[in-house]
Regions:
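Helix-turn-helix
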Residues: 2-34, 38
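Amphipathic alpha-helical linker/stalk segments
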Residues: 16, 23, 37-69
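Conserved catalytic core of Hanks-type protein kinase domains
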Residues: 28, 76, 138-139
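Short helix-capping/turn signature of helix-turn-helix
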Residues: 29, 89-94, 142
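Residues in soluble alpha-helical coiled-coils and helical-bundle/repeat scaffolds
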Residues: 30-34, 78, 92, 106, ...
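Alpha-helical transmembrane segments of polytopic integral membrane proteins
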Residues: 49, 80, 142-145
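Amphipathic alpha-helical packing segments from all-alpha helical-bundle domains
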Residues: 67-88, 95-123, 130-134, 161, ...
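Hydrophobic/aromatic-rich alpha-helical bundle segments in the mid-to-C-terminal region
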Residues: 119-166, 174-185, 189-193
Length: 193
C-alpha cells in the first residue's frame, strides 16, 4: 500500500506479497479497511510508545517530559509513518476509512490535550492549554517528520533533538507574541501580539 497507494492495492496483491492465499487475508481481516486498522494497532502494540507515554505522564520535570514526548513521536514515526500516511490517503477516497481516521484524529487530540493539561504547571506564563495543545499537534505532525527526515535528509536523532528543543522553547519558555486568544476571542481569530 505504501508504494502503490490505497486504491490501487488489492487483497490479491497483498496476499501475493505476503506469500499467502487471498482467502487467508479475508479470513484474518475481512477487508482492506480492517487490515489497515490491524496494521495500525500492530504498529502501536509492537512499539515503545505505550511505555514512553506512561513514563512521560509520570515525569515531574516539564523539560524532561517534552524530551520523552519527542522520543515518543520519533518512535511513532519510525515504526508507523507508512501506516499513518496510508490511513490519511485512504481516508481521502473511502468514507468508511475517513470515519475511522476521524476517530484516530479525535483520539490524538484528546491524548495531546491530556498531555498538555498534565503539563499545565510547567507551561510558560501566559500560554493557555488550548494554544499549547495546538502547538504540540503541529510540531508532532507526521508531515514535519517526513519533510525533515525523508526530504531534507535529517537523521532520526537530529529530528528528535530538534523536536524536543522546539517544544521546550515553545511551551516552557514562550517567545514574545505567542500567547493564546484574548478573552472572548476564538482560536481561529488568534493573532500574534
Amino acid at each position: 500500500m505504501a508504494t502503490t497507494g490505497w486504491a490501487a492495492t488489492t487483497i490479491d496483491s497483498i496476499a501475493a506479497k505476503a506469500g499467502v492465499a487471498p482467502q487467508t487475508i479475508y479470513a484474518a481481516f475481512g477487508n482492506k479497511r480492517a487490515l489497515l486498522e490491524g496494521m495500525r494497532l500492530a504498529m502501536l502494540r509492537d512499539s515503545k510508545i505505550p511505555e514512553l507515554m506512561a513514563q512521560a505522564a509520570t515525569e515531574p520535570d516539564a523539560s524532561r517530559r517534552l524530551e520523552l514526548w519527542a522520543q515518543l513521536v520519533r518512535q511513532q514515526m519510525e515504526t508507523s509513518y507508512d501506516v499513518i500516511s496510508i490511513h490519511r490517503q485512504a481516508a481521502a477516497s473511502d468514507p468508511k476509512v475517513a470515519a475511522d481516521y476521524r476517530l484516530v484524529l479525535d483520539n490524538r487530540a484528546h491524548t495531546l490535550a491530556t498531555f498538555i493539561h498534565d503539563l499545565r504547571a510547567g507551561l510558560a506564563p501566559g500560554l493557555d492549554e488550548t494554544t499549547a495543545t495546538d502547538l504540540l499537534w503541529c510540531f508532532s505532525n507526521e508531515e514535519i517528520y517526513r519533510e525533515l527526515v525523508e526530504e531534507r535528509g535529517w537523521s532520526a536523532d537530529r529530528y528528535e533533538h530538534w523536536l524536543a528543543t522546539t517544544l521546550i522553547a515553545q511551551l516552557i519558555t514562550i517567545p514574545t507574541g505567542m500567547a493564546g486568544p484574548r478573552s472572548g476571542e476564538s482560536s481561529s481569530a488568534r493573532v500574534t501580539r
